[in-house]
């Protein structure tokens, strides 16, 4: 039996507004890697309830959680980190990002709405995020093990 840690489970939101996707910085204090908002799940709360909490913490927005649209795994090939992200399509009541909003955990410091063309110029994970967000016909439902990037 391996002594590696168990995979971490996280939830993420695909939030679209006027053909733009909501992204947040993926690493504390750095903005060179972008991802969909979300985070680790806590026990005894449903995946949608975890996602509602995480999106609000990171963006100040309130979402209604829809159907799952992607399961993505990533890991550190040289370590024992392995995370399974479950992405859900979400709806919002309003798209205005409050400039004074602060993530209570201090991880997310930048949030933005991006078009597909703008997203193509950014470093984004997972690699399949654009295809899933814009519902391409060939978008995967499962994106297997990607190496983590820093």
Label every PLM stretch briefly:
Residues 3-7, 33, 78-84, 103-108:
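A generic structural micro-feature
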Residues 8, 16, 36, 63, ...:
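Short connector loops at helix/strand junctions that flank enzyme active sites
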Residues 62-70:
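A short coil-to-beta-strand element that immediately follows conserved catalytic motifs
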């Amino acid at each position: 039996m391996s002594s590696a840690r168990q995979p971490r489970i996280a939830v993420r939101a695909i939030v679209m507004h006027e053909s733009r996707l909501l992204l947040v910085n993926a690493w504390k204090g750095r903005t060179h890697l972008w991802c969909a908002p979300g985070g680790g799940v806590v026990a005894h709360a449903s995946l949608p309830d975890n996602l509602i909490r995480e999106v609000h913490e990171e963006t100040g927005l309130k979402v209604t959680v829809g159907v799952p649209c992607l399961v993505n795994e990533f890991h550190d090939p040289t370590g024992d980190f392995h995370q399974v992200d479950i992405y859900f399509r979400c709806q919002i009541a309003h798209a205005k990002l409050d400039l004074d909003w602060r993530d209570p955990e201090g991880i997310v410091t930048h949030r933005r709405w991006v078009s597909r063309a703008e997203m193509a110029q950014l470093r984004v994970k997972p690699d399949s995020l654009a295809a899933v967000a814009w519902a391409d016909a060939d978008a995967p439902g499962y994106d297997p093990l990607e190496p983590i990037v820093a």
